[in-house]
Amino acid sequence: MIDQRVYEMFRDIGRDMYVHNLVSSHGGNISVRFGDRILIKRRGAMLGRLKPHDIIETGLEKNDSGVALASTELIVHRAIYKATPALAVVHAHPRRSIALSLVRDEIVPIDNEGSYLLKKVPVVSVEFASGTKQMADAIADALRSYKCVFLRGHGSFATGQTLDEAFQWTDALEEAAEIIFYAKQLNEEMIEYRRMSDSYTKW
């Protein structure tokens, strides 16, 4: 039985992801780690309408009865938890960011908040990009150095100590992508409006 507070955390983040257009009806997944256990969205569940039975518990290392119901991208979440100190993972399909990933090798925010929160988001390419070991290894390796990365044409993976934190990076990425789109549509020369401190540029 899933703890009520844990359920509410999953429900609220899932709903926020859907409301913010970070996923389609059945897309994306989220998870948290507790020691050697993982709680993850059920395969096929709708993030915008999560129920307690849509949260599946399974092992970080070993399969058990829950693995058959877990998200198809459980392998990626496991790899991320093994490679990083993350306690939460948010995987989304943000539309403008997906479009940018098809033409860029990294997404570099041009707005102040995006630059401060993310600086840049690398775009990772793999030959087989749906729940494969190749995909899991590539994403996990990139997240050793970044808190949010993008799988080309697929979606974002963000880590945090909480789901709120991982959601923040995801939402900031899509907002930054939207601002890039607006600026490109203006078709005018960008005006440099800020200078970053030395500590920021070395980060």
List where the protein language model places each region.
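Glycine-rich flexible loops
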Residues: 1-203
